[in-house]
């Protein structure tokens, strides 16, 4: 790995900007950012991104372009940092333009569009026959772009069944404030990434209704039980759920107003119609839908998932939602 290798970041939003800074601070000097928002790209050229971060925060000056072909020309690494609803269409365009061997790195969360596939699975499937793609690595774990930019100490994971690829990404990103661990359990990591967004919606709802830490602890622990049941069924490892991509990301996402999913839950209580207008950027909604539908064939007892689905997609009332969650049969904790 050479620190002058070209890195193409796809996206110019908050997380894309944070990843660009991390990579720069890790000694990488040849970074190109592709985006479609002219103002964001102009800002990034002069060391800021005012749409997402305070102008008091000074960033490196980056090469930017609205031309995907220029961004990808003779690149070595592609970092996908765009909303999941756009990722497949964008990736299929990328595959047509490649002219060099690349390692694809995804920091996008959620499911592959119009499928039950995780993003990692979808990217791997679509690039399987492409001669230029040498692998796909998912970078995931507890991290808000707003804190990464401020160089808050952050640890997440590089995940791939090919550990050498994961280790390569680990070295590419790690620096004095941003540290990657490697792991090979793609399934478990993706289950954690999906479930934590769903549970963050629930915790946001509870928070807005005035419930406190007792309730939050119940949501997280009972939600983790459902996450484990689902993870066991689809073949993930328990150890993964107990690590950064499971419990770690759950604590972050389900307890902070910086989380779009937590904020969606709060807004849902205040103004449901307005909240649902943000559906494209709330990854937990698609995750909820996919987990609920896939569980139709598994038949697992997932009361949080089923009740939350009925609340958001089948319009039961908040009071009915509470009754479904709370008034269940008394039984042993681990039944």
UniProtKB/Swiss-Prot annotation:
This is Glycerol-3-phosphate dehydrogenase [NAD(P)+]. It is an enzyme of class 1 (oxidoreductase). The active site is at 196 (proton acceptor). One of its GO terms (cellular component) is cytosol. Belongs to the NAD-dependent glycerol-3-phosphate dehydrogenase family. It catalyses: sn-glycerol 3-phosphate + NAD(+) = dihydroxyacetone phosphate + NADH + H(+); sn-glycerol 3-phosphate + NADP(+) = dihydroxyacetone phosphate + NADPH + H(+). NCBIfam families: PRK00094.1-2. It comes from Mycoplasma mobile (strain ATCC 43663 / 163K / NCTC 11711) (Mesomycoplasma mobile). Keywords: Cytoplasm, Lipid biosynthesis, Lipid metabolism, NAD, NADP, Nucleotide-binding, Oxidoreductase, Phospholipid biosynthesis, Phospholipid metabolism. It is found in: Cytoplasm. Pfam families: NAD_Gly3P_dh_C (PF07479), NAD_Gly3P_dh_N (PF01210). The gene is gpsA. InterPro entries: 6-PGluconate_DH-like_C_sf, 6PGD_dom2, G3P_DH_NAD-dep, G3P_DH_NAD-dep_C, G3P_DH_NAD-dep_N, NAD(P)-bd_dom_sf. Catalyzes the reduction of the glycolytic intermediate dihydroxyacetone phosphate (DHAP) to sn-glycerol 3-phosphate (G3P), the key precursor for phospholipid synthesis. NADPH binds at residues 109, 145, 260, 283. Its EC number is 1.1.1.94.
